[in-house]
């Protein structure tokens, strides 16, 4: 019985992991004005391995991005953004130079103000993919430059507008990333290098308190598996 119970719990856990494998944020044009969602990022840098650049996790390199929907007008969706460089020891210096994401609906253009006041699109170093839209403090497109939001800087706030190719009732954004510049750790084995985030994770305090119907269905199915195993 214990083996069957363990298998049931493992199946439920596996289903939950698969459901949350990709971080996607969604806003409704009518119901979600004023809604804030926040993602957190880790970090990685390009280590040289056998004469190849390999994306390698770097402990302590981290940041967050919060987006608040403020207005929808035709094809234009406007958000307030807040970027925080939360890097900790052993990282002693880093700057967030770019943030960006992909969209399910095609984006035809974008604009922004504040520190991250330049928009673009294109390849993201170390990720092996291109971003539909990105906003940068310096540099070109989604690569970024040498300036940005440093560890001791105040949270960077501004506004950005996404122009979709067609009017849409739902904004669905995914594949979030940030670029880091001037990354240095305590012993300087990593000194003044650029980096990119790995996985983006939806922060718990932005999750609705009531589970969505799909989540309820998964929970009920899981409880049924466990109950059956116990019998």
Where do the protein language model's features map onto the residues?
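Helix-boundary and membrane-interface capping/anchor signal
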Residues: 22-209
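Short, threonine-centered small-residue motifs that mark membrane-proximal processing/anchoring sites
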Residues: 2-9, 13-23, 193-230
């Amino acid at each position: 019985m214990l083996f069957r119970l363990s298998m049931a719990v493992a199946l439920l856990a596996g289903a939950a992991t698969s459901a949350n494998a990709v971080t996607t944020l969604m806003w409704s044009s009518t119901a979600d004005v004023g809604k804030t969602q926040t993602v957190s990022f880790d970090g990685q840098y390009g280590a040289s391995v056998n004469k190849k650049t390999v994306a390698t996790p770097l402990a302590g390199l981290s940041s967050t991005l919060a987006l608040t929907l403020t207005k929808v007008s035709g094809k234009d969706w406007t958000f307030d953004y807040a970027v925080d460089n939360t890097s900790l020891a052993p990282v002693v210096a880093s700057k967030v130079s770019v943030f960006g994401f992909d969209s399910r609906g095609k984006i035809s253009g974008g604009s922004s103000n504040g520190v991250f006041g330049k928009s673009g699109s294109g390849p993201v170093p170390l990720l092996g993919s291109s971003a539909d839209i990105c906003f940068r403090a310096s540099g070109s497109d989604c690569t970024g430059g040498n300036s940005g939001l440093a560890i001791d800087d105040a949270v960077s706030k501004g506004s950005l507008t996404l122009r979709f190719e067609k009017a849409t009732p739902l904004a669905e954004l995914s594949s979030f990333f940030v670029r880091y510049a001037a990354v240095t750790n305590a012993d300087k084995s990593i000194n003044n290098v650029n980096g990119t985030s790995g996985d983006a994770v939806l922060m718990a305090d932005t999750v609705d308190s009531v589970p969505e119907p799909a989540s309820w269905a998964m929970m009920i199915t899981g409880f049924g598996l466990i109950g059956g195993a116990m019998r």
